């Protein structure tokens, strides 16, 4: 994101300016609005650890609008979400695809939401390997293990039987917010903040 708006607040000492994401962090809001990669994962993990250190008893709100991305980077975020003492509430705005959908489902049960026009998409992990036949075989076996791990976690998070998850993730599987709620990826649809 190249343009980041600034917020100016009045304090008893004068004016104070923040970039918008720092201001949202003060309200315990983290935003993923890009692909999941090492850089975005490092930022999100650091923000979650910071918010836990600030107050381990207050929820973190994690807004997701992501096409997905790296499985390893996504697992870094997922594991941190499970590790911190704070409940992490997830909210999909726009699209949560691939690893974005996985992270949406990883929120605290009962606190996973989507806005009404959100789209959610799950599928199996993508991969590619080059090199000697033995190396390609090693990579193929690894991606199959990764697929099985992702499917098992999605089954646990959604309550869907593992064989249904395996069938549905064989190809791109798109859902509306209503369908994602019925599937168990989210718990409710947010129309207006209360």
Swiss-Prot record:
Subcellular locations according to the entry: Cytoplasm
Task: List the active site.
Answer: 98, 123
Provide the E.C. number(s) assigned to this enzyme: 3.4.21.92
GO terms for biological process? protein quality control for misfolded or incompletely synthesized proteins
Q: Which InterPro entries match?
A: ClpP (IPR001907), ClpP/crotonase-like_dom_sf (IPR029045), ClpP/TepA (IPR023562), ClpP_His_AS (IPR033135), ClpP_Ser_AS (IPR018215)
| The keyword Acyltransferase is annotated on this UniProt entry | no
Q: Which residues cross the membrane?
A: none
Entry GO terms, CC:
cytoplasm; endopeptidase Clp complex
Alphabetic keyword roster: Cytoplasm, Hydrolase, Protease, Serine protease
Source taxon at top rank: Bacteria
The family this protein is said to belong to: Belongs to the peptidase S14 family.
General function of this protein:
Cleaves peptides in various proteins in a process that requires ATP hydrolysis. Has a chymotrypsin-like activity. Plays a major role in the degradation of misfolded proteins.
Spell out the subunit comment: Fourteen ClpP subunits assemble into 2 heptameric rings which stack back to back to give a disk-like structure with a central cavity, resembling the structure of eukaryotic proteasomes.
* UniProt protein name: ATP-dependent Clp protease proteolytic subunit
Ranked from the top, the taxonomy reads: Bacteria, Bacillati, Bacillota, Clostridia, Eubacteriales
């Amino acid at each position: 994101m190249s343009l980041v708006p600034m917020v100016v607040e009045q304090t008893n000492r004068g004016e104070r300016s923040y970039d918008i994401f720092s201001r949202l962090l003060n309200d315990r809001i983290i935003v993923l609005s890009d692909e999941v990669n090492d850089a975005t994962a490092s930022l999100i993990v650091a923000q979650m650890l910071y918010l836990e250190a600030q107050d381990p008893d207050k929820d973190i709100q994690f807004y997701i609008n992501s096409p997905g991305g790296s499985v390893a980077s996504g697992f870094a975020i997922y594991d941190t979400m499970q590790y911190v003492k704070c409940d992490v509430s997830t909210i999909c705005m726009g699209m949560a695809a691939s690893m974005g959908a996985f992270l949406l489902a990883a929120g605290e049960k009962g606190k996973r939401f989507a806005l009404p026009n959100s789209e959610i998409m799950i599928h199996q992990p993508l991969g590619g390997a080059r090199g000697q036949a033995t190396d390609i075989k090693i990579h193929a076996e690894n991606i199959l293990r990764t697929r099985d791990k992702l499917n098992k976690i999605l089954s646990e998070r959604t309550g869907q039987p593992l064989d249904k998850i395996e069938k549905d993730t064989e190809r791109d599987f798109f859902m509306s917010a209503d369908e994602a709620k019925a599937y168990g990826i989210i718990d409710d649809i947010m129309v207006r903040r209360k």
